[in-house]
């Protein structure tokens, strides 16, 4: 089982869409057994797959020791995906209940994922766009980090703080940066090379070749609670996410 944490330090980087479509492509086109984890209290991944976050338990009850992880896994209709939804309790989980007094609480996720390691080929975690307890826990549990950004100044500059955060964790726990995925890409952007250079300085050699172009069909698919592969299979977003998944699989094979 390979565990991938999908990260950003700024909202609006298509982090959740990347998580969803990487998982969907692995399941649909590569017959992989995939578990998606919504670890962001905003619960956009949960909503984007057609579930109401107010109706389901999140990993919060598992990390608090109230339920087993198998009890909170939900199969997603018409896909080969399983999901652990998010809820608002995740926002304050580390200062609640059993976790509040546990100095090693950020290592619990890694422990609980061990019980499903034979059930899935990939676990993909959608983390909050901040350097918080949830993000740290996800990175400690992960084998790989996939970083999301947009070709905008503040998004790219935020990578510097994220890089330091990841470096601190990887010094204590094995973690490989899989790559930096750029979304909302404009092939004719005047500053494309400048943004690429900034990313290269922060994460040398990690900028992925596949860029995700802006495409309204992704938002339209979310309204229906489905991946864009299901609603607009010929859209450029479908092509881009399919190619991104292929590129990442090659990297995973070679690492």
UniProtKB/Swiss-Prot annotation:
Gene3D superfamilies: P-loop containing nucleotide triphosphate hydrolases. SUPFAM superfamilies: P-loop containing nucleoside triphosphate hydrolases. It comes from the Bacteria. Pfam families: AAA_31 (PF13614). Belongs to the ParA family. This is ParA family protein CPn_0805/CP_1066/CPj0805/CpB0834. It comes from Chlamydia pneumoniae (Chlamydophila pneumoniae).
